[in-house]
Amino acid sequence: MIKALEDDLSQTFDIHFNNHALLDEAFTQASYVNEHPHQELKFYERIEFLGDAVLQLIVSEYLFKRYPEMPQGKLTRLRAAMVCEASFSDFAKECHFDQYIRLGKGEEKSGARQRSSLLCDIFESFIGALYLDQGRAAVERFVRIVIFPKLDEGKFDHIIDHKSELQELLQKNGDVEIDYELVSEEGPENDLIFTVSVTADHKKLATGTGHSKKVAEQNAANQALQLLRRPK
């Protein structure tokens, strides 16, 4: 099972572990260890502890740099949404990690392999193992593939919502007409890039791009916010 995981990591992410025991530990649950007492196995909880801390730091730094104007409270809410159980569980399934967990027979029968809390733990423990094996740079490369693109895909728009923020800023002194207009669609049909402009009382403020009109509108609003908040 671990050999299949190594092949998957190699083909999908170009990740090659040096210390294979770390990968074994990261994907082994306590129930499996208890059923194999003579194999001197370790389970994932200690590595998970480390992975959680590494993810918190890397995601925090990324958000801090990506959104230089975002208030601390909103940064905290956005980070909480990105590093929560539901998000990590989704990321684990996207990476096929659920296929490679070593479980005891009882846990397997109970459906633990698809349990959100376990998948979250496994994602964190994998990050911990990758950090121990190859350092922070390797973890950053991985999360730039798996986690950060979700921001551009609109997964966390319910927290960011630059459009509402822009509306509040522009209309604090009276009514302002804000419009979003599709400027262009470029690229192949299965990978379109949309460009949207945002105007206030028919005056163009900024443009934004994204893989959907919704995301492009949010990015246009974010660009407008940054321009409006710059010191004059």
Curated annotation (Swiss-Prot):
Cofactor: Mg(2+)
Domain RNase III positions: 2-135
UniProt KW keywords: Cytoplasm, Endonuclease, Hydrolase, Magnesium, Metal-binding, mRNA processing, Nuclease, RNA-binding, rRNA processing, rRNA-binding, tRNA processing
Residues of the active site: 52, 124
Subcellular location: Cytoplasm
Chief location bin: cytoplasm
GO terms classed as biological process: mRNA processing; regulation of gene expression; rRNA processing; tRNA processing
Gene Ontology CC terms, in alphabetical order: cytoplasm
Pfam family for this entry, one: dsrm
Residues bound to Mg(2+): 48, 121, 124
A GO MF label: rRNA binding
Residues of the DRBM domain: 161-230
EC annotation from Swiss-Prot or TrEMBL: 3.1.26.3
Superkingdom of the source species: Bacteria
Catalytic reactions on record: Endonucleolytic cleavage to 5'-phosphomonoester
Quaternary state and interactors: Homodimer.
PANTHER family cross-referenced by the UniProt entry: RIBONUCLEASE 3, RIBONUCLEASE III
Job description of the protein: Digests double-stranded RNA. Involved in the processing of primary rRNA transcript to yield the immediate precursors to the large and small rRNAs (23S and 16S). Processes some mRNAs, and tRNAs when they are encoded in the rRNA operon. Processes pre-crRNA and tracrRNA of type II CRISPR loci if present in the organism.
Stated family: Belongs to the ribonuclease III family.
Name of the protein: Ribonuclease 3
